[in-house]
Amino acid sequence: MIKKLLGIAPTPTEDGAFAPSRLALKLATSATTNYDGGAYPTPYTGRNARILVVLTEERNMTMANGKKFSTGNHPVEMALPMLHLISAGFELDIVTPTGAPAAIEMWAMPKDDAAVIKLFSDYADALKNPGSLADFAAKSLSDDTPYVGVFIPGGHGAMLGLPDNADLGKVLRWAHGKDIHTITLCHGPGALMSAQQDGNFIYDGYEIALFPDAVDKQTPMIGYLPGHMPFELGVTLKSLGL
């Protein structure tokens, strides 16, 4: 009751999970972003100009206490890189593991940001009916590829259904071998765990930036998360050599 009065109680969702508390939303989200349209006076015009955008289709993360956190792909961490890539001349193809609709953290949507809202409108069908990562892994890993990048956005949802996805691992190892760029941020690096194979990890020795475990440990206090994380992402990735 006290947490509810103070606005730090996680907000129940219709499916039995929890979204962030009122205070957490006030502290961690914004109605607008700092996107300025990008600065790309000479956009890329080459033949190979496609980016594969890999999104999670899973919604709820089970926390250490058994409660479920309503998550998905973070709209800002997804939209702003996409906007920059589009402005720089690239075309985007969206996939989820099975082709099911992409899960979006709608509670984090910057509702007054015209550029972000337009992007979600433009890609509404692609988000509802994305391509299948499984099909891509089976049919599109060619030597003569139009793809120059793989983008995995952030959001705690990137830790659901992607870290152990064999198809994603196959795509990442292919991209790595072809010197295709891999782009990810915040909790997105969790998906890189899928690239493990036979005790080898292609990113062993690399350095990355990701959301700190120390912050994830603190956010339950303000109701951003309904419980502590099921595992420490930074510690886990470091154990693999990152």
Predicted regions and their residues:
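Extended, subdomain-level signal for the structured scaffold at the beginning of enzyme domains
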Residues: 1-178, 191-242
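Conserved, well-structured core segments that form or line functional sites
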Residues: 182-183
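Conserved active-site segments centered on acidic
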Residues: 187-189
